[in-house]
């Protein structure tokens, strides 16, 4: 108990000394040990890194989860060390509503079929969004959060210790300065005509006491200077580690961009597929709508047949020879009559599975290699693909052209 009381009294004395030194520095009544310019630059760089990391972290969280209530809920789960429950994305919820609406309206109706197709695409978009959020949280948000909650807390702690060591050092310097001034005053030769012998003896005794005080202050200053230098070196090493933090965050940023690129590429591909599927449905829906109403009585048989026959897929053929008029003609593509152009062909790798819509198209399997080429006047979004004896149109977006 006696030891604890002494330690408490010592800590109180140190705290009071630091408070006095800090107050006098703020009032301009005490000298302050300045750090070197390189150290100050490291401190400013660390503070800037911390501030911008916090802003980037918060805004990325808003990007991934715009709902503030959901963010607060996830924050509480993390603080309680509990697993965050799986949350249905907006796309998946919309897909559920569309599917239920299609079942209510009738899945065989044009509107019901379209709702089912769009709902399925929305579900895939929602799943892609979920994967992107998960990937971004692990590869980008977690490293930023680890820096703020780990490395930065260590740096802040060591900086506070360095600040205390500096206050102790400046307080020792101030005490030494006062002791030397008092010693010099006590060591001054007294005027015997104005000083009585008794006061002269007291002055000599005080001079000896101040000499001891100066030696004690110098010893404390050396110890405090050593502790300050050691703590400054520790803090400097931590601050120089900010460069490694930047390298790590740069790598995480690349991973975040890659995840975001894959996410938007998936969404774009899903919407392209949906657009093509809806394009195939549109002719059927129009035909069904027209077939429900009888043709006019005055209509001729060929006209009636034209209104009921389904549309035949065609591709435009545009001549590319210089001097020939640029006229567009509609012709039906017959894969057996297609021949490679004289300019040659290219190899391509299939990126995704593709189901042929009709006999003019070629079904594809992911990662297989095919031969492709273009014909004059073809739609730039399509190529002619060959696999063995099979030929047909293939979409460019499903291919990776190889040199």
Swiss-Prot record:
Biological classification of the source: Eukaryota, Metazoa, Chordata, Craniata, Vertebrata
PANTHER family assigned: DREBRIN-LIKE PROTEIN-RELATED, SH3 DOMAIN-CONTAINING
InterPro entries registered for this protein in UniProt: AH/BAR_dom_sf, BAR_dom, Endophilin_SH3RF, SH3-like_dom_sf, SH3_domain
Cellular localization per UniProt: Cytoplasm
Keyword annotations: Coiled coil, Cytoplasm, SH3 domain
Family: Belongs to the endophilin family.
Major location category of this protein: cytoplasm
Record-linked SUPFAM superfamilies: BAR/IMD domain-like, SH3-domain
Subunit structure: Homodimer, and heterodimer with SH3GLB1.
Region (Membrane-binding amphipathic helix): 1-27
Keyword Cytoplasm (UniProt): yes
Highest taxon of source: Eukaryota
Coiled coil: 210-233
Protein name: Endophilin-B2
Domain BAR span(s) in chain numbering: 24-287
Pfam families: BAR, SH3_9
Ranges of residues in domain SH3: 343-403
Species this chain originates from: Gallus gallus (Chicken)
Gene Ontology CC: cytoplasm; membrane
Positions of disulphide bridges: none
Swiss-Prot/TrEMBL GO biological process terms: membrane organization
């Amino acid at each position: 108990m006696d030891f604890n009381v002494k330690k408490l009294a010592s800590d109180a004395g140190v705290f009071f000394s630091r408070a006095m030194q800090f107050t006098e520095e703020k009032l301009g009544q005490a000298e302050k040990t300045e750090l070197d310019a390189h150290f100050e630059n490291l401190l400013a760089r660390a503070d800037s890194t911390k501030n911008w990391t916090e802003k980037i972290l918060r805004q990325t969280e808003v990007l991934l989860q715009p709902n503030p209530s959901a963010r607060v809920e996830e924050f509480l789960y993390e603080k309680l060390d509990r697993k965050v429950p799986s949350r249905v994305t907006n796309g998946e919820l919309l897909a559920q509503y569309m599917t239920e609406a299609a079942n209510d309206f009738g899945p065989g109706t044009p509107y019901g079929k379209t709702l089912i197709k769009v709902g399925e695409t929305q579900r895939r978009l929602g799943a892609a969004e979920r994967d992107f959020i998960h990937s971004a949280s692990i590869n980008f948000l977690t490293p930023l959060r680890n820096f703020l909650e780990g490395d930065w807390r260590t740096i802040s702690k060591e900086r506070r210790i360095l600040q205390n060591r500096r206050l102790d050092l400046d307080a020792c310097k101030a005490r030494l300065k006062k002791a030397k001034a008092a010693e010099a005053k006590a060591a001054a030769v007294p005027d015997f005509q104005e000083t009585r012998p008794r006061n002269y003896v007291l002055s000599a005794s005080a001079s000896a006491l101040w000499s001891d005080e100066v030696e004690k202050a110098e010893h404390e200053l050396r110890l405090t200077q050593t502790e300050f230098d050691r703590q400054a070196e520790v803090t400097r090493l931590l601050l120089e580690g900010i460069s490694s933090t930047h390298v790590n965050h740069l790598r995480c940023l690349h991973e975040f961009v890659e995840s975001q690129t894959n996410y938007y590429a998936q969404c774009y591909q899903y919407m392209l597929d949906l657009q093509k599927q809806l394009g195939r449905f549109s002719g059927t829906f129009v035909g069904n709508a027209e077939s429900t109403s009888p043709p006019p009585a005055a209509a001729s048989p060929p006209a009636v047949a034209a209104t009921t026959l389904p549309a035949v897929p065609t591709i435009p053929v545009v001549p590319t020879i210089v001097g020939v008029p640029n006229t567009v003609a509609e012709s039906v593509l017959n894969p057996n009559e297609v021949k490679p152009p004289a300019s040659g062909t290219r190899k391509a790798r299939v990126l995704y599975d593709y189901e042929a819509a009709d006999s003019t198209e070629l079904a594809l399997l992911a990662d297989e290699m095919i031969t492709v080429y273009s014909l004059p006047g073809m739609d730039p979004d399509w190529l002619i693909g060959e696999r063995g004896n099979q030929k047909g149109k293939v979409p460019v977006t499903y291919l990776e052209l190889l040199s």
